[in-house]
Swiss-Prot record:
This is Mesoderm posterior protein 2. Keywords: Developmental protein, DNA-binding, Notch signaling pathway, Nucleus, Phosphoprotein, Transcription, Transcription regulation. Residues 57-77 have a biased composition (Low complexity). The gene is Mesp2. GO terms for biological process: mesodermal cell migration; Notch signaling pathway; positive regulation of transcription by RNA polymerase II; signal transduction involved in regulation of gene expression; somite rostral/caudal axis specification; somitogenesis.
Amino acid sequence: MAQSSPPQSLQGLVPLGLLPGLGLGSAIGLHVSGLVLRFVRFLPFYATRRPSQPAGPARSTRTTQATAPRRTRPAPAGGQRQSASEREKLRMRTLARALQELRRFLPPSVAPAGQSLTKIETLRLAIRYIGHLSALLGLSEDSLRRRRRRSADAAFSHRCPQCPDGGSPSQAQMLGPSLGSAMSSGVSWGCPPACPGPLISPENLGNRISNVDPRVTPPYCPQIQSPLHQSLERAADSSPWAPPQACPGMQMSPEPRNKTGHWTQSTEPAELTKVYQSLSVSPEPRLSLGSPLLLPRPSCQRLQPQPQPQPQWGCWGHDAEVLSTSEDQGSSPALQLPVASPTPSSGLQLSGCPELWQEDLEGPPLNIFY
């Protein structure tokens, strides 16, 4: 009654009309059972594939994230870390070596030999020992301050009380050999040359150096008299300076700074008398040959008038002044020769001769030598 069913491998594969001996109902049932078996066979595939379809984009994003380059922090290199540790070890070795060298210089009274000292103890003992040595040698701050104060007091006590700048007497020993020679000659020196000392009134100063040329500068320090002023005082006691026609062969120069020289007599007294008489002197009395003559810086000129064949020599000063002595001040007034001033004609006016023009002065016949 029951018929054998076809093998399952043939179910659903054989068409309905090819199965001989089967009715229509059995053929439909067989066909339906084959479809069910086919569906059940492929069910795991559909069950696993349907949920995986919406997860496809997530899987793609995961793959892109895995393939994309990540920004990772660079790990510290092993060489740099090792070099930093080596530098630290080297620094500690150098510090330990320096402290050991410092402990060698500490005396046993400060640091016993068998005692181990830490770094801080070594530094404290070294500071204490250095302070003790500075106090013994006088190099501490208090000792140096006392020494400076003592030297300042000593310098202030050796200052010259009369000198406003506070110069010390040792400066006088460094002024040169001239100062030493003056001191050995017996001249009294009250203070160094930079110190003028107490001032003296002009009246007293004039009494001390009387009969001296007024152009001479008075001495700077009244307690010091140089050989120049002593020679001037000796020259003041001698006879006053005489005019050129009465001078001997050796005369003193009218300038106190000039040295002695030969002053020769140039012309005869008669010729000089004619020259002096020919000069025009206004209401003041004429020059007397007997009175002494003081001519500062005379310059000699040779005057050769046209009528006379022989040359005449005379002394002519640009600012010649005749100063009388202190004895004749009341009797004879000072005679002042006129100074040649430029006139519109630029000539030299003399009383006994016509006006001399510039062409005559420059020409060869006049022969005027300055």
